[in-house]
Amino acid sequence: MSAHIINGTEIAAAIREEIRSEVIALKAKAGIVPGLATVLVGDDPASHSYVDSKIKMCQNLGIYSEHHPLPQNATIEDLLTLIAKLNADPKISGILVQVPLPAQISESLVLNAINPDKDVDGFHPVNVGRMCLGEPCFLPCTPHGVQELLIRSGIKIEGTHVVIVGRSNLVGKPLANILLQKAPGANATVTICHSGTKNLPEITRQADILVAAMGKPKFITSDMVREGAVVIDVGTTCIGYTPEGKRILSGDVDFEEVKEKAFAITPVPKGVGPMTIIMLMLNTLTAAKRAAGLIK
């Protein structure tokens, strides 16, 4: 029997409507419009596409947006000056600097320069620390999206064994921190595996919930998955192009093989991907409400 397919597009659409309603209510009751500033350095086509999708989503939800493109040869001083301006702008609730950045710009310096209260990507050290302590903070968008996918699919997280394959600062580490918190929608036992892990299949087969986030197409095969497990595929790798020039994407899981063994599984595309951008919008809304003193 094939697995239940967790449709991230449908779940993200439901959250989108919730956010739209809140944005309308916030403007009507308090005269507040959330605002997102995006910053893009250089001409990377994929980065341009990601930023465009965020701008369009803002427009769709009634969130004010500004886009600040900088040339490929921009200096760290150029970027820090812009960030300081955005930090001080009351119209801007959240700031997103699209990565990767050119080699001459230190990503850590840029992240540290963003006001933690406007760090809607959730990667400022202050927000990372708050996340580890279980305090209110902006959660990184993709890991938060994974958690919401599980919760809204009715999948129990509490008391389960979650195995995450991948230890990146973007997904693996923050997701582990989110899911091990003593809180609703978390409280799991979490194991992180990586390139140095020995006997990887033995560990992944112990997972009630298996999360693949290493960026290796079809790395997770059916022999690595326990019968009846939930499999979340965070991987998104371009493996080619259609005759029309559209990207062909592959996840980290051999979907066709694993779906015959898992209880539930996310596809690629239309799985985790749509959740990332909607969590960014949710963080932007939250930032606006916090700035207005409506929530802590």
Swiss-Prot record:
GO terms for molecular function: methenyltetrahydrofolate cyclohydrolase activity; methylenetetrahydrofolate dehydrogenase (NADP+) activity. Coiled coil: none annotated. Catalyzes the oxidation of 5,10-methylenetetrahydrofolate to 5,10-methenyltetrahydrofolate and then the hydrolysis of 5,10-methenyltetrahydrofolate to 10-formyltetrahydrofolate. The gene is folD. It comes from Dehalococcoides mccartyi (strain ATCC BAA-2100 / JCM 16839 / KCTC 5957 / BAV1). Its EC number is 1.5.1.5, 3.5.4.9. NADP(+) binds at residues 166-168, 195, 236. Belongs to the tetrahydrofolate dehydrogenase/cyclohydrolase family. GO terms for cellular component: cytosol. It catalyses: (6R)-5,10-methylene-5,6,7,8-tetrahydrofolate + NADP(+) = (6R)-5,10-methenyltetrahydrofolate + NADPH; (6R)-5,10-methenyltetrahydrofolate + H2O = (6R)-10-formyltetrahydrofolate + H(+). Pathway: One-carbon metabolism; tetrahydrofolate interconversion. The keyword Oxidoreductase applies. CDD domains: NAD_bind_m-THF_DH_Cyclohyd. InterPro entries: Aminoacid_DH-like_N_sf, NAD(P)-bd_dom_sf, THF_DH/CycHdrlase, THF_DH/CycHdrlase_cat_dom, THF_DH/CycHdrlase_CS, THF_DH/CycHdrlase_NAD-bd_dom. This is Bifunctional protein FolD. GO terms for biological process: L-histidine biosynthetic process; methionine biosynthetic process; purine nucleotide biosynthetic process; tetrahydrofolate interconversion. Keywords: Amino-acid biosynthesis, Histidine biosynthesis, Hydrolase, Methionine biosynthesis, Multifunctional enzyme, NADP, One-carbon metabolism, Oxidoreductase, Purine biosynthesis. Homodimer. It holds the Pfam family THF_DHG_CYH.
